Structure formats: C-alpha cells, structure tokens
C-alpha cells in the first residue's frame, strides 16, 4: 500500500540545511524571520517540490501542518491543495495558527502571529475545501509555546462543530516541557488535557518526552501520535517511546516533519529510521521490519482516521506503491519486504493514488521533476534575497 505521511511542513523545503547545529527553539528563532517573507508563489513552488519528493518515495497521502501566515499574504493553503491536485497526490491540509507572540511570552515574533477571530474565521472558510477522498482539512494550532489557551479551546470547539480533526506539536523537547511547567504549571500532556484535547479526534506530532502516565492517557483516550524520528534526531530532541505506545494500544504513524529539520522529504527513509531508533532504545527485538512498514502504511491511516487507505483490501482506495527488487541492494535477500525496509530509501517505480498513476518508471506522470526543481530554486532564492 502507498505510504501515509502524518506530519509535514511543505513550505520548509525552501529553507533546508539552515541552523545546522541548533536545538528546536534556536532553530525556530533563526528561521521565523525568513518564513515571515513567504508568499503564495513561494508556497506553491515549495508544495510542488515537497509533494513530488514524497510521491517518489512511495507516499500517496500527505498531512501538511501549515501554521505560518505572514500578514497580508493569502492563498497559502490553497496553493498546497492546487499543487497536490496537479501532481495527483492525496492531501490532508490544515489551517494551522499562532497567536502568542514574543511580547506576550510566546516564541514566535509578533509579526507572525494572528488574532483569534481571524484564525477561526479563516479555518471555517477553508473547511469548505474538504471532501471525502483527495482533500481533507484539519484544525491545527501550532504548539503550546506559540498559541494561547483560548485558541486551543476555541479551535477544539470549532473543529468538533465542523466534524474536523485536531492536530498540534506536543512534548517534542525538554525545553517545551520546562516552558509548560513555568507558564501553565503542568506538563505538556496535562496541558493538553486541561484544554480538552485528550480525545480520539486528536493526534500530536513528536511526543518524544512522555511519561508512563502520558502513554496510558493517549492509549486510553485514542490520541494518535505522528512519530518523526529523523527530525527529532536532527534537532537533538530525543527518541519517542514508540514501543511503549504500541504496547499500550495507541495509534502511531510516521511523519517526515519539515525538510528544514530533516532535509529529505522521503517517507520510506522514516520507515527504516523508526526501526533503528526503536532498536537503539529497546534492543534488537523492539521493532520488526514489517512492524516498521506498518507504521508507515496502516498506522498512518489509523492516525488520520482513514479506514479507506493504508492497506490493500477489497473496497479500499487503490493506493499502491511498487518498488523494483532487481537492483544491487536486493542481491542475496530472501525476504524482500524486510530487505526493502532494512536497505533504506528507494525511489518508487510506480505509484497509484485511487487507481490513477502518479509515478511511472520512477518518474512523475503529471509534471517534470527538472521543471519543479528549477522553479523551486528560483523561489528559494527569492525568499532568501527578500
């Protein structure tokens, strides 16, 4: 089955390999001023590049968490949806948000935060783009250190009224834990419970620093987790307790996260990475190759609450990823599925989304990779020059 990406930031393809030795907060503070120059043309180029890279790695469904809305700039989420439609990939887009700026104790600069009414009104407007198959919409305040308690509460109320899911970053770093304890007097998961988000219509990205009680709370309430192993290692955040979450019965899928904190939009690479970090944490039997592959397919579908994708069964969407197994890296392998996972990243040979070809012979069907890359370089240069 096609891979399912449960956490991404498409716009970040424009800012790869920056703040190379930074932790999360330093990395964000370095890049916030750059992202504040984002416009619709840049976003479209970034989305095309990011979605193309994901498709070539075998990904058929992408959740994108877009939370940067520079003042006066419109059409950013629509640009992502347009790019996904043109390439043929399924997208679950989001109306992310930040309303807690530096002057009020938040991390982002005041120039990148919006007011509550603007956020909620635009979220409701974008909800009309959702359909049952190719486009989904999620309500997604950014993080405890960039949004107010009121926005968390009112976002949940709006999402539930509209029948939409909720998503946020949570428990990614020790610095976030310290921030929540200082500002709210509780841990990130306790804060999530306080604002009414510990529920089955919620999934959270990262969840690296969870206690045993947190794991039990997520499993018991149905909160899903987007595991982003490469990004978490790149920023020195740590390793999520995925084996504990799975043993407790929690929903877990994989995410690339932004390609500014991962540098590769390759979801299949995350399958192997998930296996490696699980074994590094829990030993050689902590996660099998097939269990890791399940995280990237059926696990992701479960996190997104999609029962029509994630596996190849009668009645489900024909989301199919096909890899060749006659290359040098497969020589001597008896278990081809395990070797596909253990030998790492591979360009997909064919990719179908809902039965429609998106990749054929290792090349995009609906666009030229060279043209996407050239336009992306042009827009990245515009962003940095601005």
Question: What residue ranges belong to the model's regions?
Answer:
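Divalent metal-coordination and catalytic microenvironments
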Residues: 7, 58, 84, 139, ...
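Alpha-helical scaffold segments that flank or form the walls of functional sites
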Residues: 16-66, 70-90, 119-132, 377-385
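Active-site gating loops and adjacent loop-to-helix segments of metal-dependent hydrolytic enzymes
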Residues: 14-45, 72, 100-116, 173-201, ...
């Amino acid at each position: 089955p096609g891979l399912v990406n449960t956490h991404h930031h498409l716009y970040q393809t424009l800012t790869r390999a920056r703040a190379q030795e930074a932790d999360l907060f330093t990395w964000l503070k370095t890049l916030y001023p750059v992202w504040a120059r984002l416009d619709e043309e840049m976003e479209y180029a970034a989305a095309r590049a990011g979605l193309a890279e994901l498709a070539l790695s075998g990904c058929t469904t992408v959740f994108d968490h877009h939370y940067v809305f520079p003042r006066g700039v419109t059409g950013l989420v629509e640009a992502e949806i347009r790019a996904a439609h043109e390439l043929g990939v399924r997208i679950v887009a989001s109306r992310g948000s930040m309303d807690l700026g530096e002057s009020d104790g938040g991390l982002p600069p005041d120039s990148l935060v919006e007011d509550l009414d603007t956020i909620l009104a635009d979220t409701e407007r974008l909800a009309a783009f959702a359909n049952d198959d190719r486009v989904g919409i999620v309500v997604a305040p950014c993080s405890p250190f960039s949004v107010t308690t009121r926005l968390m509460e009112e976002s949940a109320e709006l999402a539930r009224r509209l029948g939409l899911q909720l998503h946020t970053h949570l428990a990614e770093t020790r610095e976030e834990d310290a921030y929540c304890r200082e500002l709210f007097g509780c841990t990130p998961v306790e804060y999530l419970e306080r604002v009414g988000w510990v529920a089955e219509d919620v999934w959270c990205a990262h969840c690296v620093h969870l206690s045993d009680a947190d794991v039990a709370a997520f499993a018991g309430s149905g909160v899903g987790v987007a595991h982003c192993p490469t990004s978490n290692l790149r920023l020195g955040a740590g390793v999520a307790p995925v084996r504990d979450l799975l043993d407790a019965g929690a929903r877990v899928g994989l995410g690339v996260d932004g390609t500014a904190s991962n540098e590769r939009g390759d979801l299949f690479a995350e399958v192997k990475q998930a296996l490696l970090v699980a074994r590094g944490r829990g030993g050689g039997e902590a996660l099998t190759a097939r269990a890791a592959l399940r995280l990237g397919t059926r696990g992701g579908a479960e996190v997104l609450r999609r029962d029509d994708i994630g596996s190849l069964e009668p009645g489900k969407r024909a989301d199919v990823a096909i890899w060749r197994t006659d290359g040098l890296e497969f020589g001597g392998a008896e278990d081809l599925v395990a070797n596909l996972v253990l030998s790492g990243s591979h360009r997909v040979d064919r990719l179908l989304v809902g039965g429609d070809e998106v990749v054929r012979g290792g090349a995009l069907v609906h666009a030229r990779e060279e043209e996407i890359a050239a336009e992306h370089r042009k827009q990245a240069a515009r962003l940095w020059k601005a």
